[in-house]
């Protein structure tokens, strides 16, 4: 079985992956071997040339044991057409077998020629497309076997696209987060701007209101200060008058003008009847004593004043002021309306009391609180029905109290005393020594004593 010939081995090589064809046979005459580039497996030339070739028959011993790879050659159509198969002349002993074999071989040759023509057409087609390699199909098959498959390429491309898509999605997510963060920042800045604007407007309105209130308060204080200035100017003028009148250098009596006789009270007697008594009258006037005003300070009171002068204070508990409070101030400001009298004393001490002349103000313009406190026909301190030419105001109160002339004089005498000792406390009295200050205080106490006894001066 092993030596049985195999027919058609030159056409199909079972060991070849590319199904090569045997296109050339060794010529015994020239010993030239023509091998087609498409033949991958071929028998050795020595075997083909030495052995007798039987038509369409091969022995197993003639098969190659190793694959023979032909070097790549670039053949054109002309070379392919010149390829021929040379068969040696058969021996005479086997003429009959050769004839039958030739018949079969001729049919095989025709089929090979048809296959060669088909390959030539395919080669020409590839050459017209720009490919000169006659073994393009074989090379492409090998390249497909060596290169990755289409599925792997697609999978790699799909993976790369997935990676790029994931990267783009990550970038888009980052962009969205950045946009969201910027939107939050924008909203926060807008809210802060609105709050700041609202606070600025509120602060501006608050400042305007405060400015208006301060302006109104300043105007009110200005009016009150102007009223106080007028009152103080009147008090200063009164104090100047008191100082000038109590000064020892001021004349107490002006000399009579020349040629004028002094006014005599009573009736005049007849000259005839009075001439007899003239001598006795002159003797009586001669023996009448001359009277002058004299003064002497109380030593204890003077020492108390000197002690107070060294450290002046408005505290009523000090010995000097306590005695004046008990002897002059309290009796002078004691009225039937005790509550109002206490308020008047407190206002005098705080220097917040103001006195205004009523003038010819109609009753319809008088405030209701002032009318309730007595009105211009009734004194608010004594409760007596007397014409009231002045009214007082206590501190920042809007109420006015109408007072009679005697009450007004009693209040002004106490105000004059407090004004003078305030000047001493503030160091404004510098032109007088301690004795002059003491006697000025005594003069003010005298006025308070006269006022509490009912003596007063009224302006006509």
From Swiss-Prot:
Tissue: Ubiquitously expressed. Expressed at highest level in testis.
Region (Disordered): 246-280
CDD domains: Rab11BD_RAB3IP (cd21068)
A molecular function GO annotation: guanyl-nucleotide exchange factor activity
A Pfam family matched in the record: Sec2p
UniProt keywords, alphabetically: Cell projection, Coiled coil, Cytoplasm, Cytoskeleton, Guanine-nucleotide releasing factor, Nucleus, Phosphoprotein, Protein transport, Transport
Polar residues compositional bias, start-end: 271-280
Coiled-coil spans in chain: 149-244
Major localization class: cytoplasm
SUPFAM superfamilies: Sec2 N-terminal region (SSF144284)
One of the GO BP terms on file: protein transport
Record bears the keyword Transport: yes
UniProt keyword annotation of Nucleotide-binding present: no
Subunit structure: Homodimer. Interacts with the N-terminal region of SSX2. Interacts with the GDP-bound forms of RAB8A and RAB8B. The interaction with RAB8A is prevented by phosphorylation of RAB8A at 'Thr-72'. Interacts with the GDP-bound forms of RAB3A and RAB3D. Interacts with DCDC1. Interacts (via the N-terminal region) with TRAPPC14; this interaction mediates RAB3IP association with the TRAPP II complex. Forms a heterotetramer with RAB11A where RAB3IP homodimer binds two RAB11A subunits.
Similarity section: Belongs to the SEC2 family.
Function: Guanine nucleotide exchange factor (GEF) which may activate RAB8A and RAB8B. Promotes the exchange of GDP to GTP, converting inactive GDP-bound Rab proteins into their active GTP-bound form. Mediates the release of GDP from RAB8A and RAB8B but not from RAB3A or RAB5. Modulates actin organization and promotes polarized transport of RAB8A-specific vesicles to the cell surface. Together with RAB11A, RAB8A, the exocyst complex, PARD3, PRKCI, ANXA2, CDC42 and DNMBP promotes transcytosis of PODXL to the apical membrane initiation sites (AMIS), apical surface formation and lumenogenesis.
Name of the protein in its database record: Rab-3A-interacting protein
Name of the coding gene: Rab3ip
